[in-house]
Amino acid sequence: MKVLFATGNIGKYHEAKQILARYGIEVERVDLDYPELQSDSLEEIAAYGARYCAESLGQPVIVEDSGLFIEALNGFPGPYSAYVFDTIGNEGILKLLEGEENRKAEFISVVGYCEPGGRPVTFTGEIRGRIAEEPRGEEGFGYDPIFIPEGEDSTFAELGVEEKCKISHRTKALERFAEWYKNNVAGR
């Protein structure tokens, strides 16, 4: 079984490849630049992206959109996480939280799947945690150096990709997709 993953993010691709391999699903990356829907809903963004890519490629495809929701910042950056990271980075987020005791945060990932002419299906995964006082660790990408998952003392970047892929928001969303895919699409 093989699925196309439309993403320009090589880190996401490697994580998806590792996670979906457990289900016997091979992942092929397609670097398709598609317009991102401006919405406060990760589900809407992922569904739109999946439909757009499936129609553009003429093949079934998955996309993934994720957001970091920080409680003290009223859920910011949320669905705008990629833009905010590119604009102010981890240092900017830490600056916004300077002096803030409430560092609770949640990472949410939504995987969207669509076939050409079909309706998109979405799968959500989430993980609670907190924002570190400073960036820590070398592995991963994006907000990994500042996000500490609940029950851990290490950031995602300190845990490393293999450990992160056992517990992350993206893992949960991809596992939900994989179960659905095996039961509804594979072998058709």
From Swiss-Prot:
It comes from the Archaea. InterPro entries: dITP/XTP_pyrophosphatase, ITPase-like_fam, RdgB/HAM1. It catalyses: XTP + H2O = XMP + diphosphate + H(+); dITP + H2O = dIMP + diphosphate + H(+); ITP + H2O = IMP + diphosphate + H(+). GO terms for molecular function: dITP diphosphatase activity; ITP diphosphatase activity; metal ion binding; nucleotide binding; ribonucleoside triphosphate phosphatase activity; XTP diphosphatase activity. Substrate binds at T7, G8, N9, I10, G11, K12, S66, F141, G142, Y143, D144, K164, H169, R170. Pfam families: Ham1p_like. Mg(2+) binds at E36, D65. The active site is at D65. One of its GO terms (cellular component) is cytoplasm. Keywords: Hydrolase, Magnesium, Metal-binding, Nucleotide metabolism, Nucleotide-binding. NCBIfam families: PRK14821.1 (NF011396), RdgB/HAM1 family non-canonical purine NTP pyrophosphatase (TIGR00042). Belongs to the HAM1 NTPase family. Homodimer. Pyrophosphatase that catalyzes the hydrolysis of nucleoside triphosphates to their monophosphate derivatives, with a high preference for the non-canonical purine nucleotides XTP (xanthosine triphosphate), dITP (deoxyinosine triphosphate) and ITP. Seems to function as a house-cleaning enzyme that removes non-canonical purine nucleotides from the nucleotide pool, thus preventing their incorporation into DNA/RNA and avoiding chromosomal lesions. This is dITP/XTP pyrophosphatase. The lineage of its organism: Archaea, Methanobacteriati, Methanobacteriota, Methanomada group, Methanopyri.
